[in-house]
């Protein structure tokens, strides 16, 4: 499981270094093979170990193709998916088109989301984190299904 938020630098060639604390798990789960695609809701990228992505692809494949919203989601996620591999130094190249979509430039946040990571522009992530915290603290903002969650 991937958790935590990590500030990392995007180099001039568009490469990011995966923090070492995640590398062993990525190696064991998918031999360092990753898939990056756009997030269909937020202005960020989703980075999956190949084994996790294959589960998502199977679910997308099984969607009814006569529904336009299903085809749209398939086009967005699968059409923008790119295979990546960690190099010997634990780096991977984020394709220019995807960097542009997420507005990634120099400082990037790699955010663990249990089965995947999100890649955010650092300023966008900080603004969202502040907004999320303010929103969840408002009275009545907690969804019913979370009210009984024990932390």
From Swiss-Prot:
Alphabetized InterPro entries for the sequence: MraZ, MraZ_C, MraZ_dom, MraZ_N, MraZ_sf, SpoVT-AbrB_dom, SpoVT-AbrB_sf
Cell membrane listed as a keyword: no
GO biological process terms on file: negative regulation of DNA-templated transcription initiation
Superkingdom in the source lineage: Bacteria
TM region positions: none
Main localization (coarse): cytoplasm
SpoVT-AbrB domain: residues covered: 5-52, 81-124
Record family assignment: Belongs to the MraZ family.
Oligomeric form and interacting partners: Forms oligomers.
Record protein name field: Transcriptional regulator MraZ
UniProt source species: Pseudomonas syringae pv. syringae (strain B728a)
Organism lineage string: Bacteria, Pseudomonadati, Pseudomonadota, Gammaproteobacteria, Pseudomonadales
